[in-house]
Amino acid sequence: MRSLTRRDFVSLAISALASTTLAACSSQNSGSSSAANASKDPVTLQIFAANSLTEAMDNAIEIYKTSHPWVSFRDSQYLSSGDLNAQLQSGAYADVLISASADKMDIAQSKGLIVSDTRRDLFNNDLVVCARQNSGYRISSLADVVSGGYKLAVGDESVPAGNYACQSLYSVGAYTSAEGRGGFFVGISPLLDSSVGNVCKHVQSGQVDLGIVYLSDLYRFPGLEIVYEIPESVHDRIIYPGAICTTSSKQEAAQEFLNWCKNDTDAISVWQQWGFAMA
């Protein structure tokens, strides 16, 4: 797990996000070669990515297009990792799949939805308990979350964030399955949602006191604060794997984009600005 001191910099990073993003974009644009670009054939890519990547990926795509002007993107699909798999299995077209769960990517691989040898781990994330800013809540453990009488929201078991949350709650006896799915809650009745973004919205609105979400979600949803960082030892590592889809007719361009996401300094800057760490 990344250093817990990251929580001290979340609000600062959020406030600096707009200016640093523009700086990265300017750097990419100034470094592009118009002569090389002119020789490239136009290509359009379709990206399927986990919902928690929405803002970061949109930001990255805009920067990518400044140095790759021959590449355009269809409306990227941002859904839960399970829903993305279901769409691909139903025949939807995509060039690149990025999941918020190694398990969900394993399923995609087992069903032949991705080109196996293109799979690579791209990003890591952390799991946190969040509340509205200036909540005044003093929480030092998951046991406090469970026993403190708080209204809690978590993702349901169809989404990776929900699985990670339930694995964590299992560690304090508040969920019955160590795998984070197929069990039931003990002593609590959390509000369940099929989107980790909606969990954040429930906290924002005051419908619940606390939510278990990704660290990166606090960069997407203003007005929230971290009240507890959940140790990685009580849940699976949060890894975002990416791969080329077997449906892709533009695998060379898709591979170039994946390589850029993983290795380019401006891309890495974008992911970090939105709260992700590189895998």
List each model region and its residues.
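Exported/periplasmic ABC-transporter solute-binding proteins
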Residues: 25-66, 77-82, 86-89, 101-102, ...
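N-terminal secretory signal peptides and thylakoid transit peptides that target proteins
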Residues: 1-20
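A short, gly/pro- and small-residue-rich
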Residues: 111-118
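Short, glycine-/small- and polar/acidic-enriched structural segments
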Residues: 118-127
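A generic structural motif
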Residues: 68-74
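Periplasmic-binding protein-like
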Residues: 94-99
